[in-house]
């Protein structure tokens, strides 16, 4: 991914 996002568990996803 490009922007920093958080999944339903609060983990950072890129």
Swiss-Prot record:
Quick one: a GO cellular component term? extracellular region
One Gene Ontology term from the biological process aspect of the record: neuropeptide signaling pathway
Residues with Phenylalanine amide modification:
14
What Pfam families has UniProt attached to this entry? Sulfakinin
Keyword Secreted tagged: yes
Could you tell me the keywords of this UniProt record? Amidation, Neuropeptide, Secreted, Sulfation
Q: Which residues carry this modification: Sulfotyrosine?
A: 9
In its keyword annotation, does this UniProt entry include Cell cycle? no
Q: Where in the cell is it found?
A: Secreted
As for family, the record states:
Belongs to the gastrin/cholecystokinin family.
Function of the protein: Myotropic peptide.
Designated name of the protein: Neosulfakinin-2
Q: Which organism is it from?
A: Sarcophaga bullata (Grey flesh fly)
- Kindly list the organism's lineage: Eukaryota, Metazoa, Ecdysozoa, Arthropoda, Hexapoda
């Amino acid at each position: 991914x490009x922007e920093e996002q958080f999944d339903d568990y609060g983990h950072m996803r890129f």
